[in-house]
A protein has these predicted regions:
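Active-site residues of response regulator receiver
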Residues: 8, 52, 81
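The feature encodes the CheY-like receiver
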Residues: 14, 56, 70, 81, ...
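Short hydrophobic/Thr-rich beta-strand motif most characteristic of the beta2 strand and flanking loop
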Residues: 25-32, 36, 40
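Acidic catalytic/metal-coordinating carboxylates
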Residues: 32-33, 59-62
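Short amphipathic alpha-helix used as the core "switch/output" element in two-component signaling
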Residues: 39, 61-73, 91
Length: 113
């Protein structure tokens, strides 16, 4: 199946998404911040990235912009947040995000995306 990178500063979210995606047969790598996400992206190719918008070191929209301007936004990215506004979601899709998931994320929401 797919090789997926989950980027979220909340351990519970990373664990939940990893469990759901592994149960569906996907290979999952986890990153707790933008620094780890950059390293994971540099080390491997992903079929999909699930990227949290609000993280302590660099927010997900800034990381998305960084990947787009560097020409490494070669995979679909689904942005995630429990606090984002519609404007933030629209900005992310303009930059290149494929979709947006509002937290809390359920199995049905995730598999629909």
């Amino acid at each position: 199946m797919a090789n997926i990178l989950v980027v979220d500063d909340e351990l519970g979210i990373r664990d939940l998404l990893s469990e759901i995606l592994n149960d569906e047969g996907h290979s999952v790598d986890l990153a707790e911040n933008a620094t780890q996400a950059r390293a994971a992206r540099a080390a491997g190719m992903y079929d999909l990235v699930l990227l949290d918008i609000w993280m302590p070191d660099t927010d997900g929209v800034s990381l998305l912009k960084e990947w787009a301007s560097a020409g490494v936004l070669t995979m679909p990215v689904i942005m995630m947040s429990g606090h984002a506004t519609i404007d933030t979601a629209v900005e992310a899709t303009r930059i290149g995000a494929f979709s947006f998931l509002e937290k809390p994320i359920t199995l049905q929401k995730l598999l629909k995306a």
